[in-house]
Structure formats: C-alpha cells, structure tokens
Design a protein with these regions (language model features):
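Catalytic core of non-heme Fe(II) oxygenases with the double-stranded beta-helix
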Residues: 71-144, 151-155, 159, 165-173
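Fe(II)/2-oxoglutarate
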Residues: 1-2, 175-177
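Aromatic-acidic/polar surface patches that form glycan- and anion
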Residues: 45-48, 94, 149
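Non-heme Fe(II)/2-oxoglutarate
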Residues: 1-70, 86
C-alpha cells in the first residue's frame, strides 16, 4: 500500500514547538488531539509547512510528478496516548486527494497505524520515529489505542491534491485552480 517512504527526524526545536502547541491546545484529554479542523491559529505551522514541503517535493520528484504537475498539500498534527481515544478507520479521499502521508514524529514500539482491507484485515507497516510514509488517499487506515503508559504518540499527516497534471499532451485541471 505504501508508495513512498523515507526517514527524517524533526529538529529538537521544531519537535519542542509541536509539544508546546499540543499541550496548550489539547482540551479534551479523553479524546485524541488533532489540528485537522483548526490549524489556522497555530504558529507551529509556520515552521512545519516548509519542513514538509521539502520532503513532499523530494517524494513528488521520486514519483515522477514534480515536473509534470502543480499540487497543494495540507498538514495537521495529532497526538494520542493510553488515556485518549484512538483514530477509527477512515480514508482521506473525497475525489480530490491523490496521495496521503504521515510522519511519525514520536511513536512507541507498538505498531499503532494500520491499513484495513475489504475483509477487515489489518496490515501494520513499519513505523519508527522519523518514518514518513505515503499511500493512495483512498486506502482505509486507522490507529490502534496506545498501550504504553505515559507515552504521547505524535504524528503529522496530510494530503496532496494535484491541481494540474501535464503529460503527453494530456492536461488535467482540478477545480482548485
């Protein structure tokens, strides 16, 4: 299911910025924390967006898309631990997204992230701190509850939407132009 992967750790400063942002914005301690619905007011994204932009550009180059497409990407943060809920199975595809990704900023030894197939079988890819993986946005995936006490599982995730694709005189434009 994974179409691209690398390992890139966050700088100590950027990771500290993420922790501070999570600690000051995580209100319901029983629910996993996400900035998916409200990331505009968090200053940490001023530094996360360029960090992930470099990784995504490398990925798009390796996948052969950097030179034949224009794209947008999104970024959000999430945190869960043994006291919070997990992230139930879901997919990111709404008709626009092509590639989804997750960066495991801090993860336990337990593999929590999984893909789920049509028979409800779970497949757990390798997931170590610093790993960045990408997959087709239509793939159903989820996160099991963290079992390790006093451990915050922290990730950044996002989607890539192709705004324009040009190859062999085929030009596709999305409604996002």
């Amino acid at each position: 299911m994974i179409i691209w992967r690398t390992n890139q750790s966050l700088s100590d400063g950027l990771y500290s910025e993420m922790l501070e942002s999570i600690e000051s914005n995580h209100e319901n301690k029983k629910e996993f924390f996400t900035t998916f619905y409200d990331k505009n007011n968090l200053d940490v994204f001023n530094n996360l967006v360029p960090f992930y932009g470099k990784i995504i550009s490398k990925m798009m180059t390796d996948l052969g898309l950097e030179h034949i497409s224009r794209y947008q990407y999104t970024v959000w943060m999430q945190m869960s631990n043994s006291s919070t809920t997990s992230h139930k199975p879901h997919a990111h595809f709404t008709g626009l997204e092509s590639i989804s990704w997750v960066h495991f900023a801090n993860v336990p030894d337990q593999k929590c992230f999984y893909f789920k197939d049509s028979n409800s079988n779970k497949t757990y890819p390798d997931q170590n701190t610093g790993d960045f993986i990408a997959w087709p946005s239509w793939a159903i995936h989820g996160v099991d509850e963290v079992k390790q006490n006093n451990f915050d599982r922290i990730i950044c995730a996002g989607n890539i939407v192709l705004q324009e694709y040009n190859f062999n005189n085929l030009k596709l434009l999305s409604d996002l132009n």
